[in-house]
Regions:
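N-terminal module-boundary/linker segments of secreted carbohydrate-active enzymes
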Residues: 22-89, 222, 238-240
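Domain-level detector of nuclease and nuclease-like folds
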Residues: 113, 122-240
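Intrinsically disordered, low-complexity proline-rich regions
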Residues: 16-19, 90, 168
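Generic structural signal of hydrophobic/aromatic residues within well-ordered alpha-helices
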Residues: 54-58, 92-96, 100, 226-233
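Compositionally biased, low-hydrophobicity segments enriched in charged and small polar residues
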Residues: 47-54, 112-116, 173
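Alpha-helical interaction segments
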Residues: 6, 61-63, 182, 193
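Alpha-helical transmembrane anchor segments and their immediate juxtamembrane flanks
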Residues: 1-28
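Secreted/periplasmic proteins that engage bacterial cell-wall peptidoglycan
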Residues: 68-140, 144-145
Length: 240
């Protein structure tokens, strides 16, 4: 994840077009021919979303209250991590391969990450990852826009296929410190921000971009919190 200064604007983490829609479709309308790409390169090599873009997207988002959480279950977004591109690798391992360095793979596997190093974006600290029953949770894959948050802000109306694609969309996923991810829970920008302040611009811009691509809405408090962060981004130096 790389931040660059371009034309005086802070350019943030590269993002895939979230829903990878084909012409004639809109967010929430699944296209059965769309496949999620294998993400093995840093996102910044594919595209970039700037603070300026995120500010504009934020102002275009619908603002209203949360819908009831009634009916929410993780399985509404699919049965765990999927293999949407049918390459034999589940999304969790694809994100670990993308975000960790110095990785080793399980013997005989092209997918399963046995160990690696993470520079955690949420805390700014380094984490040694070792796969195992008692150690894997040290690094978790976070949905930047939490699934429960999405459920209460538009995803209830999606098809099951769209929800599964959202849950496995690399643009909305980050490998992060496990305890910090647990503390975040299903918080939005109004209720939780990364402790690592230098990453907050990137984090909020990613949330806004994902919500814009999937036509999710924000609450008034969330809108105001995201705006405060984005308006202050010019004062922040790159995180890397």
């Amino acid at each position: 994840m790389i931040l660059q200064i371009l034309g005086g604007a802070l350019v943030l983490i590269g993002l895939w077009r979230v829903s990878q829609l084909v012409p004639g479709t809109t967010a929430g309308e699944p296209d059965p021919g769309v496949e999620a790409p294998l993400m093995t390169e840093p996102l910044a090599k594919n595209a970039a979303a700037s603070v300026t873009t995120a500010r504009a997207e934020l102002e275009d988002l619908d603002i209203k209250g949360r819908a009831p959480k009634t009916g929410y279950d993780r399985e509404q977004f699919g049965d765990g991590w999927a293999d949407l591109d049918d390459d034999g690798c589940h999304t969790r391992d694809e994100i670990l391969r993308r975000d960790l360095t110095d990785i080793t793979l399980e013997a005989g596997s092209d997918c399963v990450v046995d160990s690696g190093q993470l520079k955690d974006p949420y805390t700014g600290t380094g984490i040694d990852f070792t796969r195992g029953q008692d150690t894997s949770t040290a690094v978790q894959i976070d949905h930047v826009v939490a699934l429960s948050d999405a459920w209460q802000k538009g995803a209830q109306q999606w098809t099951a296929a769209t929800r599964e694609r959202f849950a496995n969309d690399p643009a909305n996923l980050l490998a992060v410190d496990g305890p910090t991810n647990a503390a975040k829970s299903d918080g939005d920008a109004a209720t939780w921000l990364p402790p690592h302040k230098a990453f907050r611009c990137e984090y909020v811009a990613t949330q806004v971009h994902v919500k814009a691509e999937y036509a999710l809405w924000v609450t008034p408090a969330e809108h105001d919190a995201a705006k405060r962060v984005l308006d202050a981004c010019h004062a922040l130096a790159p995180t890397h």
